[in-house]
Design a protein with these regions (language model features):
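Active-site environment of non-heme Fe oxygenases that use a 2-His-1-carboxylate facial triad
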Residues: 1-77, 82-88, 92-97, 104, ...
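A short alpha->loop->secondary-structure connector
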Residues: 107-118
Length: 334
């Protein structure tokens, strides 16, 4: 179907109003959720249990422990992600009381209360450490393991099934920088619908995506997905301009002029300071985002310790996906 034909079938001009916020229409009281004393007490009991009977983190299931208050907390998080702001920051867990592996267990169990925790790498790793490893940015080395800033993006946009939700559990904050930014792709979609429906229509057709080397050796290095999809009255988005530009290079296909113009127009909207909120994620906070309707970025940061010493900014990242398998792409295992 041609782009001009697609324009006739775009969604309504204004969609998903609770999620179509801007900097001036949202405040921190809408995304902050306090941790109850009851939940902290449950976590203290959980850690005591694991010290008596250590088990592999990924073998742990919420139902095996008494975590009713924490489960109620994560139900509140999910409600914000699905029907409200699309962003939730839980403030905060006493991570300083626990060892790193115990905090990993806490992060895993909290994420599991939201639903299926899925792989973030082709090797099946479901717990992903976001920290500066000292590696230079290059093919197969994501910005998440450097101290570089990141442009606005959604996670896993190259996958067959991108994660529904992305969580960051802050085990240590940076000495300087590392600020988190969030923007509504629903708002951006609405703006393009009003201003340039022809460019929005192009974003509903496929682009090549860099798969980041996270695939079998004999698989293609790029996949194909649109930026926007609209089905059953629900908008879904995948966004990472760098991965699209690199994807076309890897696929050996030229990025068309209309596609390039559409990406530039979308970037101008999400990069506009009026479109995003910014704050520092503090030690002990758990940040969750609706990854299919919101994009996030971070500023560059500086750590007190070098990566080689094992210190510095450390986030435990978790992906949740409601459908498909737990494997990276979400396809059934073969």
């Amino acid at each position: 179907m041609r782009v001009d034909q697609l324009t006739e079938h775009l969604p309504p001009e204004e969609i998903e109003r609770p999620k179509a916020w801007t900097r001036d229409t949202i405040s921190s009281d809408r995304w902050l959720i306090p941790v109850s004393e009851a939940c902290v007490a449950e976590l203290d009991q959980l850690v005591a249990s694991l010290r008596r009977d250590p088990r592999p983190v990924e073998s742990l299931a919420p139902a095996a422990f008494s975590l009713r208050a924490c489960s109620d907390l994560m139900s509140e998080v999910r409600a914000k992600l699905e029907t409200d702001t699309g962003l939730a920051v839980v403030d905060r867990f006493p991570v300083e009381r626990y060892e790193t592996e115990e905090n990993r267990a806490i992060g895993w169990l909290l994420a599991a209360m939201l639903g299926q925790v899925v792989a973030q790498k082709a090797n099946g790793a479901r717990l992903y450490d976001v920290k500066d490893t000292g590696q230079a940015l290059g093919y197969g080395v994501r910005r998440s393991v450097t101290n570089l800033g990141q442009p606005f993006h959604t996670d896993g946009g190259w996958l067959w099934k991108a994660p529904n939700f992305v969580g960051l559990f802050c085990l240590e904050s940076a000495l300087e920088g590392g600020l988190s930014r969030f923007t509504s792709l629903v708002t951006a979609h609405n703006a393009l619908r009003r201003r340039r429906p022809d460019l929005l229509a192009r974003l509903y057709t496929p682009f090549a995506w860099d798969r980041q080397g996270e695939h079998a050796p004999d698989d293609g290095r790029a996949s194909e997905h649109p930026v926007f999809e609209y089905e059953g009255g629900v908008l879904a988005a995948r966004y990472y301009e760098d991965y699209i530009v690199n994807g076309h290079r890897l696929a050996g296909t030229a990025l068309d002029d209309l596609g390039r113009e559409a990406l530039v127009a979308l970037r101008a909207i999400v990069d506009d300071e009026a479109s995003w909120v910014e704050f520092r994620i503090e030690k002990g906070q758990l940040q969750y985002l609706n990854n299919r309707q919101f994009a996030h970025s971070r500023t560059a940061f500086k750590d007190a310790d070098t990566p080689q010493k094992g210190g510095g900014r450390h986030m435990l990242r978790l992906w949740n996906r409601d459908e498909g398998s737990w494997h990276l792409e979400g396809r059934p295992a073969t």
